[in-house]
UniProtKB/Swiss-Prot annotation:
UniProt gene name: uxuA
Family named by the database record: Belongs to the mannonate dehydratase family.
UniProt keyword annotations, A-Z: Iron, Lyase, Manganese
The protein's annotated pathway: Carbohydrate metabolism; pentose and glucuronate interconversion
HAMAP family: UxuA
EC top class named in words: lyase
EC number, as in UniProt: 4.2.1.8
The protein's name: Mannonate dehydratase
Length: 348
């Protein structure tokens, strides 16, 4: 298992030097953030990114992510050209020795929270999702602004894309995902790249949009779309656990049994009323996930891929990108590494 850390490039207040000082840290999870969605990532740009990371004594473990254009998700006629571009990006990454790509198939919005700075009694702040608040939000009126979302939509564009998705139900979205997978995975497999689809976050419909990568049944359906290790998942335990109907340990075990876990996100959350939740510190006692059992499964099934501490709180007065500060994620990384060492030594 390779400990890794998300880095958002030159604009990230967390530097590669900062990350390299975290004990057990080996890899970087990053992307090229200024290439418009749907365009090819050139080998030159990939080489530049790789050289910068390696100059800091680290390696690129995973690309997170190569975004999937909305026209692909909507099944529009333009999707074939966009998929061709996606395939070329996969090939270019493979040519530079990068073999794992995380992506998602969430319509319009990436991960969704209703508050980016909920304050805990100890003064730390965290991301939370309040189901009641979410039902009162209207994305068309610009009430939503979260990291990871495409802020380039005007009000008119947002209305148009939301209207377009009104014609797309879950089965149609599955159909469009299947089309994408059957084009992408043979090409990824041929160049030794493992794709790792990220679950919907949270894993249920929001704002009337369909969401399909939501739990155990979805994973079992997904892996059957194309039978290949290259057609794998990102086991984001915090995302799956944010639906109280999901048993995250059952999901994790089954995903490992299927041999489709290509990347792991370690994040803890504390379930609230209904489908509300708060992101917490990583240790098990602070959330609803038994992180020790998750790491035991990683060891039991011989997982050798990258794992990263996912969203962290803002602590010790740190400011920056919500969920992606240095300090709490560094604590999370060392906590997970400690669990892993304990599991290994305890199994002998």
């Amino acid at each position: 298992m390779e400990m890794s850390f998300r880095w958002y490039g030159e604009d990230d207040p967390v530097t590669l030097e900062n990350i390299g000082q975290i004990p057990t840290m080996k890899g970087i999870v990053t992307a090229i953030y200024d290439v418009p969605v749907g365009e090819v990532w050139s080998r030159e740009r990939i080489q530049q990114l790789k050289e910068k990371v390696e100059a800091a004594g680290l390696k690129i473990s995973v690309i997170e992510s190569v975004p999937v254009h909305e026209d692909i998700k909507l099944g529009r006629p333009t999707r074939d050209l966009l998929i061709d571009n996606y395939i070329q990006t996969v090939k270019n990454l493979a040519a530079e020795g990068i073999d794992t790509i995380c992506y998602n198939f969430m319509p319009v919005f990436d991960w969704t929270r209703t508050d980016l700075a909920y304050q805990y009694p100890d003064g730390s702040t965290a991301l939370i999702f309040d189901e009641t608040v979410s039902k009162k939000m209207d994305p068309v009126n610009g009430e939503l602004s979260l990291p990871g979302w495409d802020a380039s939509y005007s009000k008119e564009e947002m209305k148009a894309i939301m209207d377009a998705y009104a014609e797309i139900d879950e089965e149609k979205l599955w159909e469009n995902l299947t089309y994408f997978i059957k084009r992408i995975i043979p090409e990824a497999e041929a160049v030794g790249v493992k794709m790792a689809i990220h679950p919907d976050d949270p894993p249920y419909s929001i704002f009337g949009l369909p969401r399909i990568i939501t739990g155990l049944e979805a994973i079992e359906r997904f892996v059957k779309l194309y039978d290949s290790k290259s057609n794998g998942i990102t086991l984001c335990v915090g995302s799956y656990a944010s639906d109280p109907q999901n048993d995250v340990l059952e999901i994790s075990r089954r995903a490992f049994e299927l041999d489709r876990v290509n990347f792991v996100h370690a994040r803890n959350i504390k379930l609230g009323d209904g489908k509300s939740f708060k992101e917490s510190a990583h240790p098990s006692e602070y959330g609803s996930i038994d992180m020790y059992e998750v790491i035991k499964l990683c060891h039991e099934f011989g997982f050798e891929g990258a794992i990263r501490p996912d969203h962290g709180r803002m602590i010790w007065g740190e400011t920056g990108r919500p969920g992606y500060g240095l300090y709490d994620r560094a604590l999370g990384a060392t906590y997970v590494s400690g669990l892993y060492e304990a599991v290994i030594k305890g199994s002998k």
